[in-house]
């Protein structure tokens, strides 16, 4: 995704053990990492207590509250800034999310053309493939057009 999108002053508010943050830093992105629970990386902060962020936001949120993460993210970033969420492709489904997508359409959805492996804690032992499709959902605050779908490796 970073081949086609640029990000600045990134907040990663669900950093866990830092897997995403570390990769972003390797790629030259300035990242501020935190999580509600201390998992040994980044600061400890409740994302829903943040009222404003003067930069972009990239995260892999807990799926059970992903919609809440999207909506809060779009409240705290400034107009024109980006929110990128790594989510299951099935995040596109559902009546409640449909209403959210109508109110806050993503600018681009980057669908992985191959199934990628995800493992809690980064432990890929026992994972030879994935049954789940993932995508990067990218919002730009203030965007009002139709979402574009792109495929990435």
Which residue ranges define each predicted feature?
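Class I S-adenosyl-L-methionine-dependent methyltransferase catalytic core
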Residues: 1-153
